[in-house]
Amino acid sequence: MIKKDKNELNEMEYLVTQENGTEPPFQNEYWNHFDKGIYVDKISGKPLFTSEEKFESNCGWPSFSKSIDDDEIIELVDKTFGMIRTEVRSEDANSHLGHVFNDGPKESGGLRYCINSAAIQFIPYDKLEELGYGDLIPHFEK
């Protein structure tokens, strides 16, 4: 399992995960990344999303229609910046991940998890077994 100590985070990773920051749109690692695999919490290594649920939303951040396991996601009311939104945090590391909106693809449930690349790590499909995520391979068998 991939894990990262909070002391090893770069400036943007720390800003996003620990200070509830947001990275710039269209200038982050995974906004336009569609390789087959999973996305895990940058700190805890817990699986959060698969490429099967990732979609192009034109918002500039990685977007997913659902999480792998709802028990790994915490949703909180966010009233910052004069808006009312739903913040998404990781259960295990309590890291800020991004926000969830109800403007996602209707055929996939209507949700759009808008996630900061700085809060997640991509694990390629062909490395799942080797890195301890082999139990997630069935998520790709349709």
From Swiss-Prot:
Keyword Transit peptide tagged: no
EC assignment: 1.8.4.12
SUPFAM superfamilies tied to this protein: Mss4-like (SSF51316)
Record-linked PROSITE patterns: MSRB
Gene3D superfamilies in the record: Peptide methionine sulfoxide reductase
Keywords of the record: Oxidoreductase
GO biological process: one example: response to oxidative stress
Active site: 114 (nucleophile)
Protein name: Peptide methionine sulfoxide reductase MsrB
Organism, as annotated: Staphylococcus haemolyticus (strain JCSC1435)
